[in-house]
Amino acid sequence: MPRPILVRAAIVALLVAAALSPPTAAGSIRAGRLGIGDSVMLGAKDELHARDFGVVDAVVSRQFYDAPARVQHWKRLGRLPKNVVIHLGNNGIVRASDCSHAVQAAGIHRHVFLVTLKVPRSWRILDNRRLRFCARRFANAHLIDWYANSRDHPGWFARDGYHLTASGQTAYASLVARRIAAVP
């Protein structure tokens, strides 16, 4: 028969583990949508959650080269949903190989949505070309053309030209949700 102290220790360990688990992790399975991004996506986090994103895995200054590892992380946890949205590249270049590896890491039974950039930086044009190419290259990859949909709406952006205002957050999340809904 287990000692009462060991039983209490086991219960405490379970409670601590439950408290430390990310509260939205289980939601990723239920909602079927995961966002991987940088500060732009992070700014729209609440709007994305309102549109059934279980997890918005976005941090300030994240680079596109982090995308394959983030996809693999959620896959290893068994929490990679059917729809994965990747919006990275605002902080540096998108390499074609990183884009390919991110899509391949998701697997052929998941949809990967690549979001184009609206950032006033020298690499934007080339990054958007690479994102378009990557979306065309894989049957399960799809493009969300944020650049084309947002370039004529300066009110959607803060002074820096790419972080989102409240109306920009709403427009961004709406576009992403509509594009996901359009894919069978």
Residue ranges: model-predicted function:
Residues L34-I36, F113, H142-I144:
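Hydrophobic/aromatic beta-strand patches that form the interior of the parallel beta-sheet core
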Residues I108-H111:
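A short helix->loop->beta-strand "cap" motif at the edges of active sites that frequently abuts
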Residues R124-P184:
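Catalytic His-Asp segment of secreted/periplasmic serine-dependent ester chemistry enzymes
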Residues M1-L34, M41, D46, L77-L80, ...:
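N-terminal secretory targeting modules
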Residues D57-V59, V115, I144-N149:
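Conserved beta-strand termini and adjacent loop/short-helix elements that scaffold enzyme active sites
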Residues G27-H101, V119-L126:
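Conserved SGNH/GDSL esterase-like catalytic core that processes O-acyl groups on lipids
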